A protein has these predicted regions:
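N-terminal intrinsically disordered/low-complexity leader segments
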Residues: 1-6
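Short secondary-structure transition hinges
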Residues: 93-133, 163-164
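Hydrophobic/aromatic residues within well-ordered alpha-helical segments
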Residues: 50, 57, 61-65, 85-92, ...
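Solvent-exposed, amphipathic alpha-helical segments
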Residues: 10, 14-21, 64, 68-75, ...
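Amphipathic C-terminal alpha-helical segment
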Residues: 94-98, 134, 141-144, 151-171, ...
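Helix-turn-helix
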Residues: 10, 14, 18-52, 56
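Hydrophobic alpha-helical connector segments
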Residues: 56, 60, 70-98
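Amphipathic alpha-helical packing segments from all-alpha helical-bundle domains
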Residues: 66, 70, 113-140, 145-149, ...
């Protein structure tokens, strides 16, 4: 089992490098197999399609983002609910901009993931939205889940600025802040 996990890690590492250097669309499974120096049957036994590999990479990136939450939240102690959410979103934008190439590929090709991966991705999104939900509950706001879905959607509207126009985290935030206000009233 350890060999299988080791091979999976090698496949994911090689795939990320190939996707980032050549583009997701330009990389095939044969190239991934060659990059890890294994026989095709060994890699195919992992039962990972190219879209599964991408999903695994995105889930790993999300886990890294989630692991940073205690550190992130330690920086957000005071302020109004809007100020806390703004600071939190700006920090998340910085993380996503640091990882923009992989985020771009995930946004374009995430539609091809299986329901299993989409479910895991959604669970991670809920974990990332938890601090905002907590602040809203503490503030006594109603319909917190719907507000969080709205903020998550708005987040990606702002992130498009980074993807398309090379916006900084502050510029992404400035693009959505006027609309963000409506979710905390």
């Amino acid at each position: 089992m350890e060999d299988k996990e080791s091979l999976k890690l090698q496949v994911l590492t090689a795939s990320r490098q190939l996707f980032m250097s050549k583009g997701y669309e330009n990389v095939g499974m044969r190239e991934i197999v060659a990059a890890v120096g294994q026989q095709p049957t060994q890699v195919y036994r992992l039962k990972l399609s190219k879209s599964d590999i991408l999903a695994e990479l995105i889930l790993d990136l999300n886990n890294k983002q989630i692991a940073q939450l205690p550190k992130v939240l330690s920086k957000i102690k005071d302020g109004s609910i809007l100020e806390k959410i703004v600071k939190y979103i700006e920090i998340q934008y910085k993380f996503d901009i640091e990882n923009i190439e992989l985020r771009k590929v995930g946004a374009v090709h995430g539609w091809s993931w299986s329901a299993k991966y989409e479910s895991k991705n959604f669970e991670q999104i809920l974990k990332l939205m938890q601090p905002i939900a907590q602040w809203m509950n503490e503030e006594g706001l109603d319909d917190v889940n719907s507000r969080c879905v709205g903020i998550f959607s708005l987040y990606y509207v702002g992130f498009r600025g980074a993807v398309i126009n090379n916006f900084s985290a502050a510029e992404c935030l400035a693009a959505i802040k006027p609309s963000l206000i409506y979710f905390v009233k």
